[in-house]
Amino acid sequence: MRFLLTKRAFRIFNPRFQRLWLTSSPFSSTSNSGGFPDDSEPESWRTIEGLLRSPANFSPLSPITFLERSAKVYRDRTSLVFGSVKHTWFQTYQRCLRLASALTNLGISRGDVVAALAPNVPAMHELHFAVPMAGLILCPLNTRLDPSTLSVLLAHSEAKILFVDHQLLEIAHGALDLLAKSDKTRKSLKLVLISQSNDDDDSDEDSSSTFASKYSFDYEYETLLKSGDSEFEIIKPRCEWDPISINYTSGTTSRPKGVVYSHRGAYLNSLATVFLHQMSVYPVYLWTVPMFHCNGWCLVWGVAAQGGTNICLRKVSPKMIFKNIAMHKVTHMGGAPTVLNMIVNYTVTEHKPLPHRVEIMTGGSPPLPQILAKMEELGFNVSHLYGLTETYGPGTHCVWKPEWDSLSLEERTKLKARQGVQHLGLEGLDVKDPLTMETVPDDGLTMGEVMFRGNTVMSGYFKDIEATRKAFEGDWFHSGDLAVKYPDGYIEIKDRLKDVIISGGENISSVEVERVLCSHQAVLEAAVVARPDHHWGQTPCGFVKLKEGFDTIKPEEIIGFCRDHLPHYMAPKTIVFGDIPKTSTGKVQKYLLRKKADEMGSL
């Protein structure tokens, strides 16, 4: 059965997967299987007398049901705030129905892809509901993509229409021009302009109006939305395995891959993330995580499940973070380590004490002791998460235990640095030898590859069957991350497989070296990669961004500091000062740094 399920699931990763999914897939409604991936009912349903599967006891899971419920239960409660723009949950529901209707009226049919290029503005929030409500697949795109990469992703996703924010119209047109040149037979993509709101305080009005007047577009967002019908009948998924979104990986290694999410996975991960974030009803969530990144860690849907309020931000800045926390009584937020760094390094005189405690989720790298201490001092409670685009964002959580509160800061930091245990949406999380698939000892020392299994693992890579097969070898999803496991079941990431530095036959964890570098008082950010060496094979090369006021520091001082805190073979032999390239989600683009280190050659 496992082989049959896998074989059938792979059928969707055809260049025309939308059509295959709907017509020939055994998961489609024509098989009458609903949420079951086989054509027949489960064995127990056939052998136990009196059981019957019907609409009375089964319907495909989908996060769009959260909005339907909130429109009734939380009808008049505020769903979204953007400047002085406020919507209730009923208004959001009505707007999403109209937008879904308008998309259908444009001739975009079930299974087609709708692309979106926008920051955390109301339209981006509404598209997460309206697109699947029309039976379509949302493809949120990284707002920091260049026209060349954007054109590749638009072609690969086979998007039929592109929603684009007014500030990104120039980039979108550049991508469409490249797309037209590369494929003469391709029909022109319809372009929907998300216009500037009068209440968009973070927007540059002059440049925005210039872009809108200089570049053409087919429809304007609000005008298109108003053309729709608020009585539109939602096009529910025929099967909960139907795709709800395609999320492209952040491009930290090479060209992004399209990760397919299902309605089922999005539903389960939304609830799991709500649980691990300890969200009770009526949370107030500040959007510092990009909605285009793993659908905002699935909290675009999760906040709706709890009838919460979304505080949208076009741009993330410490000033806007503190302002909105105080103004809207924010309870939860999230962000990469760069966001935490931004907060604690904000001009001290401008810090306003938080009026209440704020829960903040972070992932990407463990919080450093000095960052954690400062965040707690300011009134934030930091939770450490870990996951990948392929696991719908957060897949693990460093679940905090009350008995740890009395420990020293150093001990608490060590515990909080661990990536923790799987959340409730996953069946399994393990650290295994990727060659033997044996679980490594839980001694906190033996390294293996982190592997996931469960309902919140991606359906696969869009139109890349070989990559999907490789990722699922041995019936586990291979993360590519190296970790150790502790006796209590918590895991701790040590490095990416490809980032391990082998010097003189010794394995060096780049993460360990980065932690020491970042503990230096002058260092704001650091990333470590391998530099070729004729004698040792490779040596650590540190790329360092200094804090303001430390411009006179020398590389030798940083190297000496590392030698004082690490075995000498692990200390960087090279230090390069400057900005560190990152994706828009805050992940370091180490492939660019490796290229620089390779160009340096041997010491």
Swiss-Prot record:
The EC number(s) this enzyme carries: 6.2.1.-
UniProt signal peptide: none
A Pfam cross-reference name: AMP-binding
Single GO biological process annotation from the record: fatty acid metabolic process
Gene3D superfamilies for this protein: 3.30.300.30, N-terminal domain of ligase-like
Tissue expr: Expressed at low levels in leaves, flowers and developing seeds.
Keyword Chaperone carried by entry: no
Lineage: superkingdom: Eukaryota
Molecular-function annotations in GO: ligase activity
InterPro entries: AMP-bd_C, AMP-bd_C_sf, AMP-binding_CS, AMP-dep_synth/lig_dom, ANL_N_sf
Reaction(s) catalysed (UniProt annotation): 3-methylbutanoate + ATP + CoA = 3-methylbutanoyl-CoA + AMP + diphosphate; hexanoate + ATP + CoA = hexanoyl-CoA + AMP + diphosphate; butanoate + ATP + CoA = butanoyl-CoA + AMP + diphosphate; pentanoate + ATP + CoA = pentanoyl-CoA + AMP + diphosphate
UniProt similarity note: Belongs to the ATP-dependent AMP-binding enzyme family.
Protein known as: Isovalerate--CoA ligase AAE2
Source organism (scientific name): Arabidopsis thaliana (Mouse-ear cress)
